[in-house]
Amino acid sequence: MMRTAVPPVACVGEPRLTAGFAEFGRLDLAAHEEVHGPIGPMEPAQLLRLAEGMQLKGKGGAGFPFARKLRAVLESCERQDLAAVVVVNATEGEPASWKDKVLLTRAPHLILDGAALAAYALDADEIVIGVADGMVGRDSLMEALEERRMPVPTTIVSVPHRFISGEGGALVNGINGLPHIPPGTKKRSSDSGVSGLPTLLSNAETYAQLAVAARLGPYEYAALGTDDEPGTVLLTVTGAAARPAVVECTAGMPLRDVLDLCEVPDVQGILMGGYHGKWITPEAAEKAEVSRKGLAAVGGTLGAGIIVPLGVDTCPLGEAAQVVRYLAGESAGQCGPCKMGLPDLARAVDLAVAGSQPADVVRAAAGEVKGRGACSHPDGTARFALSAIEVFAEDLRLHSTGDGCGRRVRGVMGLPGAPDVNPQKLTLDWSRCDGHGLCAHVVPDFIRLDANGYPAFPPTPVPTWLREGALKAVKVCPELALRLAKAE
């Protein structure tokens, strides 16, 4: 799916957030009111009872109870005698996620309804909606705001489109005109957020779910879903899916039903929860239910509802290595363990994939960054890398021989930017090689000497960060036996 296109949408079961999509495509205000009906304001106690009764948890990945956030802001406003600000986090910095873009482009009024409910209950001064610059959905959101009257002034703020854009503290910093990175120390936005005021900050889908429940009431809302996770879930299914889509399904539904809907073929593993998520095996996927509890039971995580299955023709560790390199580059660069440790972790994963280092090097590098940053970025990256080497242990064994797994890296993880358009691999003219061994000294991370003193290296493409060293090794070969060739 291109990042400039409106994603396809599918539904398993009763549509709620996606109701009316089939009939109207995008719901303008008239269509929105026809499909969802009217909605009235709520006093603080009413909104708290609703949020608690529906057991609403944040849909941005962390799953923090919305009622606790709301109560914290109410108490902070009273304690400090300050007005509140409501912030909608629609930045969706995770490249593999599309659910917020769907809501922005197809159902913007649901998001605005939820934000308006919160603003009225808090007697807020303003609503701020954070979106990524150049993001799909901004125009739709602006059109929706022009169609209606909000209870308080409402503005849209664009922030840099980066992975860490969705971190709450980074968004507040960006809105306040500061560098759009997480604060160096933990801060509670409920005490001091936008303009130093108590701030209610939650994800776009969270506000949309609140708007749905306000019309249904907590009991009817809970008619779908599980006892501890009522309602529906928005998922983004990509990867090997023949029909990639954003899917709305009932919480607790078998994962297999969602995979079948998106025509997912046989897989080696499935990434659950996105780039800060975890991989699960095909066997685990057959038993999994789509809920936080259900996925945790099989070793996965729901996160922001991202599902990336990998087909059997794809090198899973090569795909994972690309993601870890991307995440290392997305560091805010303000915390030493993250700034220095994540590139080390990416290097360790690359070396393990190349067969140059054992998996213990990855585990050690991950251990150096876990719990050592101002935000959860290093922890999430470490979790992703460790999960990959655990679930794809057999592939790792094949890579450890230096011969690789025999499958290609296809770039199916949804990473932004163009893939490597000129992948290159090393080749050797055995009739020329005299075993001088200079090449192994130039780029020891990729070339080693076998028992007879001749060079040995993986048949896989040379990692981009080793490309310069490989080229130097080619140049110093006295017999002109070593060459760089296009990798097919």
Go through each PLM region and give its residues.
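Ferredoxin-type iron-sulfur electron-transfer modules in oxidoreductases and energy-metabolism complexes
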Residues: G37-L50, L82-A84, A90, D100-L104, ...
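Iron-sulfur cluster-binding cysteine motifs and their immediate structural context
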Residues: P337-P343, D379-G380, D434, L438-Y454, ...
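Short loop-to-beta-strand transition segments
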Residues: A124-I127, E263-Y275
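Cofactor-/ligand-binding subdomain signature composed of acidic, glycine-rich
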Residues: M2-L48
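Histidine-anchored nucleotide/phosphate-binding helix
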Residues: A107-A121
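Conserved phosphate/anionic-ligand binding catalytic regions in large, soluble enzymes, centered on
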Residues: E52-V73, R162-N173, A328-M340, G373-A385
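Hydrophobic alpha-helical positions that pack around
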Residues: L82, D133-A251, C262-V264
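Gly-rich Lys/Arg/Thr-decorated short loops/hinges at beta-loop-alpha junctions or inter-strand turns
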Residues: L29-E33, V88-D100, S192, T236-A241
